[in-house]
């Protein structure tokens, strides 16, 4: 017997799916950079990309982009954010740490008790782990992946509630 909560979640998912798919399909003609620049909730990261001169990395190639939401950046101490802005190499490497070789969709919320860990390489040369486990939000580097699987012309974008620091 389905619990009321599971039944409600299933119904909500069924109702929302056409809207989500339409929105995701609309992104396919855009690059990751265009999507980031048009999304107010990731404006700090858009600023970091521009300040580091990394627009091309977000416009060409095929990558997985893990974009920190503004709320995550706001939780970082102000002095650290200033370091990202003033120390060009630290800022550049931190931004590139959010670009990975993982271009597949992330399957989350399986609900079957299974889990999967995938180690991915970033353009900063680091390795981070994506974890998908049962009914929990998937994570990357320990940070929740809050929005997943926005296909863009040059890869796949995901929003994360954290910053993948070096």
What is each PLM-predicted segment?
Residues 2, 6-9, 13-166:
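Mature, structured domains of secreted/extracytosolic soluble proteins
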């Amino acid at each position: 017997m389905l619990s009321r909560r599971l039944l409600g979640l299933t119904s909500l998912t069924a109702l929302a799916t056409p809207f989500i798919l339409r929105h995701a399909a609309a992104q396919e003609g855009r690059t990751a950079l265009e999507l980031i620049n048009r999304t107010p909730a990731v404006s700090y990261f858009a600023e970091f990309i521009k300040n580091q001169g990394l627009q091309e990395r977000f416009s060409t190639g095929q990558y997985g982009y893990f974009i920190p939401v503004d709320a995550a950046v706001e939780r970082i101490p102000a002095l650290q954010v200033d370091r990202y802005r003033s120390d060009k190499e630290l800022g550049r490497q931190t931004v590139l740490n959010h670009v990975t070789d993982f271009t597949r969709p992330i399957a989350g919320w399986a609900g079957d008790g299974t889990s999967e860990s995938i180690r991915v390489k970033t353009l900063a040369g680091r390795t981070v782990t994506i974890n998908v486990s049962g009914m929990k939000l998937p994570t990357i580097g320990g940070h929740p992946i809050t929005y997943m699987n926005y296909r863009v012309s040059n890869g796949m974008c995901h929003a994360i509630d954290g910053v993948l620091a070096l």
